[in-house]
Swiss-Prot record:
GO terms for biological process: chemotaxis. Belongs to the CheB family. Contains a C-terminal catalytic domain, and an N-terminal region which modulates catalytic activity. The modification 4-aspartylphosphate is found at residue 62. The gene is cheB3. R.sphaeroides does not have a cheB in its group 1 operon. Part of the third chemotactic pathway (cheOp3); there are 3 operons encoding multiple homologs of the chemosensory proteins in R.sphaeroides. This locus, and cheB2, are essential for chemotaxis. CheB2 is not involved in phototaxis signaling. This protein is able to partially complement an E.coli cheB deletion mutant. It comes from Cereibacter sphaeroides. This is Protein-glutamate methylesterase/protein-glutamine glutaminase of group 3 operon. Pfam families: CheB_methylest, Response_reg. Residues 11-128 form the Response regulatory domain.
């Protein structure tokens, strides 16, 4: 009888100055049989000593550290040992700019340190942290199929919780509008797309999975780099050419038609596909409000958020594009969108900006005839 060796566990180095946080992260990491704690240390110097003996597969890093701050340590890691890093911090107010800097320095993911006020929140936090750690290794291992989650999550809610489904209905011609959904790897991918767009780009509405407090700084940073205007969403904000609106962290974003144009709604509510904001919620609102006036783009990310409601967009007459596997950090959401029949075209990351502009031109030519 042939025996098969178990797949090696992903070794995680935890770096956090709080003993309580280290203990919490150890329990979370060890709850996933695909992960193991290599070491849990209080500062960057202890982490460096641990790494002289053994290199981890992923580092779970707090930014607020004694002696050497987390950003400085992250910069040194990327220069000397480019190991996947997941930043996990509770500093989402004054530290928000630092979080965006962490992404630019090469952190694979930035997540908020869980409050864990009840059992459900602890369970959801465990799933998010383990997913982030597992996703951080995807670019190295190039898995196209995510491994099954070992944790038993609570009920996975659909967009029906926020916006009831309805059959496709004809909608009047309006301005074109582009709806984009992204998750793991999306911050860098969105920067690549948005910085390639001219000021004449069609209106864009974006859901990027990020926690509360991160998206304002993310939008400001993109706004400083782009020819288009990039803003964090506010309720009833006008959607207009040359503007990209990014969903607030921890709030759903919906598209609403107003005469020949659009505004956005910012809503609280249940997690959909275990996310708030949810791509499915945005895409369903686009299917119902914009129909064939919309382009849906689903980009790199783990899981299936956006897949079901991208199919609704396509059924309502929208054009739809998925980022291709080769250019994704994690080929999860695009793969699921293809599987659900919601994708009209598959394109590499470096072609998405051109496709957005082509859509805008085609739609404008169609409406002026």
């Amino acid at each position: 009888m042939t025996t098969h060796a178990a797949a090696p566990s992903t070794r995680v180095l935890i770096v956090d100055d709080s003993a309580a946080a280290r203990a919490m992260f150890k329990v979370i990491v060890e709850s996933d049989p695909a992960l193991q704690v290599m070491a849990a240390v209080p500062d960057a110097f202890a982490a460096a000593r641990a790494m002289r003996t053994e290199l981890p597969d992923v580092i779970l890093l707090d930014l607020e550290l004694p002696s050497m701050d987390g950003l400085t340590f992250l910069r040194k890691i990327m220069q000397q040992h480019p190991i996947p890093v997941v930043v996990c911090s509770s500093h989402v107010g004054a530290g928000t700019e630092a979080m965006v800097s962490a992404l630019e320095l090469g952190a694979r993911e930035v997540i908020s340190k869980p409050a864990a006020r009840n059992d459900l929140e602890r369970q959801e936090a465990s799933i998010r942290i383990c997913d982030a750690i597992r996703a951080a290794t995807e670019t190295t291992r190039r898995r196209s199929q995510p491994e099954p989650r070992p944790l038993a999550p609570g009920p996975k809610l659909t967009a029906d919780e926020i916006l009831p489904a309805r059959p496709p209905r004809p909608v009047p011609e309006t301005m074109p509008v582009v709806c984009i959904g992204a998750s793991t790897g999306g911050t860098e991918a969105l920067r690549d797309v948005l910085t390639a767009l001219p000021a004449s780009a069609p209106p864009i509405v974006i859901v990027q999975h990020m926690p509360r407090g991160f998206t304002a700084a993310f939008a400001r940073r993109l706004d400083s780099l782009c020819a288009i205007e990039v803003l964090e969403a506010e309720d009833e904000m006008q959607v207009m050419p040359g503007r990209a609106i990014i969903a607030q962290g921890d709030r759903h974003l919906l598209l609403r038609r107003r005469n020949q144009g659009y505004r956005v709604s910012v809503l609280d509510g249940a997690y959909v596909c275990r996310h708030r904001p949810s791509v499915d919620v945005l895409f369903r609102s686009a299917a119902q409000e914009a129909g064939g006036n919309a382009l849906g783009v689903i980009m790199t990310g783990m899981g299936d958020d956006g897949a079901r409601c991208m199919a609704e967009m396509r059924a309502a007459g929208a054009e739809t594009i998925a980022q291709n596997e080769e250019s994704c950090v994690v080929y999860g959401m695009p793969r699921e969108a293809v599987a659900h029949g919601g994708v009209g075209k598959v394109e590499p990351l470096d072609r998405l900006a051109a496709r957005i502009m082509e859509f805008g031109r085609r739609h404008t030519e169609r409406t002026v005839r």
